[in-house]
Amino acid sequence: MRLDRIIAVRNDKTVYKDGNRCLKVFRSGYSKADVLSEALNQARAEEAGIPVPKIREIAVIDGKWTIVSDYVTGKTLARLMVEEKEKKKEYTELFAELQIGLFSKKCPLLTNLRDKMRRKIAETGLDKELCNRLYERLEALPEHDKLCHGDFDPSNVILTDEGTPCILDWAHATIGNASADVAQTYLLFRLKGDIPGAESYLKLFCQKTGTAREYVEKWMPIVAACRMAKCNEKERGFLYSWVNAPDEY
């Protein structure tokens, strides 16, 4: 095994290039069940006809669980949006269209989003009254069966050297309401401080699907609470401001 270079470093994983393979090496002690779940989600996405890196094996390297997949050559949309600022609107439109395309795919065996949200709200450490209010909001919103990526961010979409998209990181994939996934992506833009990008993205999604912005906004307090289950202190303050949005929001 020859690890050419580190591609990315996260709190719980390091991603390496190894020739024509990509190795996602999880930290020691990382849940085996979570690793296998992520790999299974990605395999199901592939079987649904979604462009994803093909998984080649699940391995243990130096005692650490590792997902081995094809290495995809290209640049992320996040990088392209920075390098080619004059084309940011074009890339944002492509990004929105890719997500809309995901919503048309069927992956019935994925985790139910509503069930996952209930669990995440319980893990936030928020007071009981606020949690109950979030549960009530969640129950009042429609339950759908759309494929939701759960972490759909420009950094998780590669535009290959051939000009085709490839979607990464399927750890949080579920089936549920598409507008919840859109609310998640909107907040990801906002967490990075890209308010114009967030607004442009949401406007494009609403225009292309005929979805009212107000409907997407109803999901934002719930999505923000779910992200609070695993976030740093800086993010927590920002997310809490969304969780505490008025009930009529």
Residue ranges and their predicted role:
Residues 4-36, 43:
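ATP-binding glycine-rich loop module of kinase domains
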Residues 40-51, 102:
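Structural motif at the C-terminus of the N-lobe alphaC helix and the adjacent alphaC-beta4 loop
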Residues 54-65:
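Short beta-strand micro-motifs within the conserved protein kinase catalytic domain, predominantly
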Residues 63-76:
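Conserved short submotifs of the Hanks-type protein kinase catalytic core
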Residues 85-113:
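Internal "kinase-insert"/substrate-recognition segments embedded within catalytic cores
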Residues 104-150, 158-161, 166, 241, ...:
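An alpha-helical support segment within catalytic cores of ATP-dependent transferases
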Residues 169-173:
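Activation of the activation-loop gatekeeper triad in protein kinase-fold domains
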Residues 184-249:
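Helix-rich C-terminal or lid/interface subdomains of diverse kinases
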